[in-house]
Amino acid sequence: MLRMAPKTVGAVRNLNIHEWQSKQLIQKYGGRAQSGEVAFSPERSRDIAKKLWNQFPGCKFVVKAQVLAGGRGKGHWEHGMQGGVKLAKTPEEVYEIANEMIGHKLITKQTGAKGINCNKVMVCGAVKILKEFYLSILLDRAMGCPVIIATSQGGMGIEEVAQKCPECLFKVPISVKNGPTNEQLVKLAKDLGLEGDLVQDCVDNVKALYQVFDKCDSTMVEINPLGVIETPTDEKVICCLDAKIAFDKDAAFRQKEIFALRDKSREDPRDVRASLADLNYVGLDGDIGCMVNGAGLAMATMDTINYFGGSAANFLDVGGNAKKEQITEALRILNSDKHVKSILINIFGGIMRCDVVAQGIMDAVREMKLDLPLVVRLEGTNVAKGKEILKSSGLNIIPANDLGDAAKKAVASLKH
């Protein structure tokens, strides 16, 4: 029985934007979100805090690291400071916290041990939070429709809630054609324990969040926490205190304004290169680079490598109809990863022709003067031509007969 390969560290079909951008989008569609300003330097963060201090003397502040990763609150910094969301009492404290965040790495459950570099923070006025909830809208493929998931256990990881208290989760299936009904949202608000005017306020805000989900081709809108806060005028209102929104990359052609928000400087350079070449790539922590056509075959390849004692350095799906140039770029990406010590190419040619793959491999190996062990398994359309191209190339390529053979040879190549 195969052992499962390590869990991937990111999605390959989504665009993710920062919290401050997500909140602006929510406000655009009529939702209430905690406002704040972004600072790229500690000095700017102090200036923002001073401006708030002048408007609301004696107010407190929240400094939030702007990184494309969840779990900030429970994360820690490379230099030891705890938390990517910190409370400050004065503008000078805001400066000191921002100085510990900007230019440093934040490590969370989602970033792995390497962490992620922070180059900006969001400075907000602190608010009095009376209650916290979790709410998300996402696609449920099993149900074939969008689903609202909510719980009164806000501020926690939803996975933790689902494990410890599954009965605390509320799921509301939504009609794709009509969207959420008032009856559905009123019931949800009451299930969350809201009363009086807060029920309708919750309904209005969830409707706004669904507009973001629907109109912007979102794959996920996650608010954690969604809070009941007390305003300076002692009014109790619903407010999005944090926001994470992801978008379907296939919608880029009609969501140009949103996709212009993409922060490539915060992404793995390999991810950016793969995206530009229309390749599906996710970096992992192993040392065997993989290039495969088809997500299912890619997962099977990673599992088989793991079964034979190896560890995949990536998930890389070149798709079912890759051109020679894409094959070449895929190999360049693998070769650029300093952790990769061996490469396994596993291609099953249906629409894709094995001779095209072989030509791309040969061109890339010669161009890069690749000196890593390279194991190639080809099967399918024009496989004989493909194998002949590789055999006659004179290159040091290790042929494999099947997936198991390829995985064993890739793992063995690390020992030579």
Curated annotation (Swiss-Prot):
Binding site for substrate: N293, G350, I351, M352
Keyword presence, 4Fe-4S: no
Keywords: ATP-binding, Hydrogenosome, Ligase, Magnesium, Metal-binding, Nucleotide-binding, Transit peptide, Tricarboxylic acid cycle
TM annotation in the entry: none
Cofactor(s) listed: Mg(2+)
Class of enzymatic activity (EC top level): ligase
Keyword Metal-binding: yes
Pathway the protein takes part in: Carbohydrate metabolism; tricarboxylic acid cycle; succinate from succinyl-CoA (ligase route): step 1/1
Alphabetized Gene3D superfamilies for the sequence: ATP-grasp fold, A domain, ATP-grasp fold, B domain, Succinyl-CoA synthetase domains
UniProt site (Important for substrate specificity): K60, K128
Enzyme Commission identifier(s): 6.2.1.5
Transit peptide limits: 1-14
PROSITE patterns: SUCCINYL_COA_LIG_3
GO molecular function: ATP binding; magnesium ion binding; succinate-CoA ligase (ADP-forming) activity
Positions of Mg(2+) binding: N224, D242
Localization of this protein: Hydrogenosome
Biological role: Succinyl-CoA synthetase functions in the citric acid cycle (TCA), coupling the hydrolysis of succinyl-CoA to the synthesis of ATP and thus represents the only step of substrate-level phosphorylation in the TCA. The beta subunit provides nucleotide specificity of the enzyme and binds the substrate succinate, while the binding sites for coenzyme A and phosphate are found in the alpha subunit.
Quaternary structure, from the entry: Heterodimer of an alpha and a beta subunit.
Protein name, UniProt field: Succinate--CoA ligase [ADP-forming] subunit beta
Naturally occurring in which organism (per UniProt): Blastocystis sp. subtype 1 (strain ATCC 50177 / NandII)
